[in-house]
């Protein structure tokens, strides 16, 4: 099958059915008609020359801000990409949007703004692309919600687009010489150091050393946490050039990617490849397979469902379960494993893992990518994983025979829940509930020593869902504190909120319906027995139907926490977690 035929047959949604002849097919509406003279006058003011008005315009958007290591370098990458675009004979139109640092806001009310920043990013990219008639888009994200945000926008505006991932951070190194601290540390080490400190495993000097050196410079949090999970998913989907997700932020490869992006996007435009040609059901199945095989974040469930929705593709948590049932966990990445993303490029990068999965018949090979190659064609060009490498385990000897992402249903979550269960803490848990109305109350109880080793406890943190919190904040601070305190095998953690990609332990989140909507999680009381059976995808509250009916009758919906501003709007519009928390369902 020829390339043009592949593009045409893969195209499901675009209004154009042939390879683009006119590369400025949108911007010409502004730059060419004499009746748009005022528009052209405005462009002259920005530095346009006469010859620029015929050039295709590429919106180069970054999620830059200086206050976060994930994003602090993105303006530099934007400038570099823009220079490359100009050299390719195109016109770079630079713009920027906001971000939220989960690592900084974690454990505070600021985390309520995190998930809704995904929608702001998607809306802002869609808005400027459509309003300013840009012909193509280079998106430069780096922190957790950045990647799904820009991908959602691509699905909406459906103009030739390439994502340039900001890149992963390098590991940090402690300096105090303590044998209790790993030689390679990262942001999760800093979170866990608090639990280790309050349990007297760490001295104050050791805790301070971890905090000071966990993040050595620019780049996204280093393990297979949410940012690296979603960057990898974007690459498997086909929205990046090869190995964009595995080039570290501080690397010559990342700079070379930016320096060559002009020719890449020009080729994408010439071939007429649009995001919805790439974002097919088969491509999403590939992305899910990769996420499961490499131990990716539970947030991938929310985000990939939302990205699929933007492209008109029906995807649900049940698709994750179907794929997880037959996909072994083979990536030995933090938080539950040993390695960080910066290690992967040393064994061939994301493309080598794709090649391994494809050669073992685990991926669809006919999906399209931004370079015009199919996934299979890219895989054939990629190097094989070197013999003896230990980051990706052989399929014959996996870390876990099936996936770590488990979709659970039962009397506690009739609309579904997402479990992150690697098997290290087991696959079955039965314990008595200890209920907290917000995460801060749990941290205080832990500090007081109320959560005890040897007692099988199911910690329930509720009213943290998309509408109830609002914003469905992540529970990395509680999960890290539990692990740091050494309670990973004694405590299961349940919430209608989310978990960070850096979380590990016996964790169940995304519980639907959430407490604020009258879901069963809102009716749990201290001492209730709860069973989590990951092998059978069940999560049940062992309380009689009669008792639950009585509790439901006396339940009163809490008043909204916000009645003005962005979170108030979000709470009114957001769909449930099983539908991706989209606002336009």
From Swiss-Prot:
Induction (free text): Expression is significantly repressed when the pH changes from pH 5.0 to 3.0.
Cofactor stoichiometry and binding remark: Binds 1 [2Fe-2S] cluster per subunit.
Residues involved in [2Fe-2S] cluster binding: 70, 143, 221
Any one GO molecular-function label of the UniProt entry: 2 iron, 2 sulfur cluster binding
Catalytic activity as recorded in UniProt: (2R)-2,3-dihydroxy-3-methylbutanoate = 3-methyl-2-oxobutanoate + H2O; (2R,3R)-2,3-dihydroxy-3-methylpentanoate = (S)-3-methyl-2-oxopentanoate + H2O
Regulation of catalytic or functional activity: Catalytic activity is inactivated under iron-limiting conditions.
Xref: PROSITE patterns: ILVD_EDD_1, ILVD_EDD_2
Pathway given in the UniProt record: Amino-acid biosynthesis; L-isoleucine biosynthesis; L-isoleucine from 2-oxobutanoate: step 3/4; Amino-acid biosynthesis; L-valine biosynthesis; L-valine from pyruvate: step 3/4
Residues at the catalytic site: 500 (proton acceptor)
GO biological process: branched-chain amino acid biosynthetic process; isoleucine biosynthetic process; L-valine biosynthetic process
The organelle targeting sequence, given as a residue range: 1-20
A single Gene Ontology CC term: mitochondrion
Key words, A-Z: 2Fe-2S, Amino-acid biosynthesis, Branched-chain amino acid biosynthesis, Iron, Iron-sulfur, Lyase, Magnesium, Metal-binding, Mitochondrion, Transit peptide
Entry-linked SUPFAM superfamilies: IlvD/EDD N-terminal domain-like, LeuD/IlvD-like
EC number(s) on file: 4.2.1.9
Cofactor: [2Fe-2S] cluster; Mg(2+)
Biotechnology usage: The branched chain alcohol isobutanol exhibits superior physicochemical properties as an alternative biofuel. Overexpression of isobutanol pathway enzymes such as ILV3 can enhance production of alcohol precursors and are of great interest for biofuel production.
Function: Dihydroxyacid dehydratase that catalyzes the third step in the common pathway leading to biosynthesis of branched-chain amino acids. Catalyzes the dehydration of (2R,3R)-2,3-dihydroxy-3-methylpentanoate (2,3-dihydroxy-3-methylvalerate) into 2-oxo-3-methylpentanoate (2-oxo-3-methylvalerate) and of (2R)-2,3-dihydroxy-3-methylbutanoate (2,3-dihydroxyisovalerate) into 2-oxo-3-methylbutanoate (2-oxoisovalerate), the penultimate precursor to L-isoleucine and L-valine, respectively.
Additional remark text: Present with 171000 molecules/cell in log phase SD medium.
HAMAP family hit by this protein: IlvD
Protein's name according to its UniProt entry: Dihydroxy-acid dehydratase, mitochondrial
Organism: Saccharomyces cerevisiae (strain ATCC 204508 / S288c) (Baker's yeast)
Underlying gene: ILV3
